[in-house]
């Protein structure tokens, strides 16, 4: 399926200092991977679960 363009963005932790475990879609490996999110800002390539990431962006 056509994945949204934000799936191609690099994970962005944003400007806050939280340490939230989130998932992002990695275009090169075609996998949903973990990164740590600060809690504000960032971009749309940021999911709470791997399933949500896979449903939106595809990948493994």
UniProtKB/Swiss-Prot annotation:
Disulfide bonds join 7-57, 16-40, 32-53. Keywords: Disulfide bond, Protease inhibitor, Secreted, Serine protease inhibitor. It is found in: Secreted. SMART domains: KU (SM00131). InterPro entries: Kunitz_BPTI, Kunitz_BPTI_sf, Prtase_inh_Kunz-CS, TFPI/VKTCI-like. GO terms for molecular function: serine-type endopeptidase inhibitor activity. Its main location: secreted. Residues 7-57 form the BPTI/Kunitz inhibitor domain. The keyword Disulfide bond applies. GO terms for cellular component: extracellular space. Expressed by the venom gland. The record marks 17-18 as: Reactive bond for trypsin. The keyword Disulfide bond applies. Serine protease inhibitor. Belongs to the venom Kunitz-type family. This is Kunitz-type serine protease inhibitor 2.
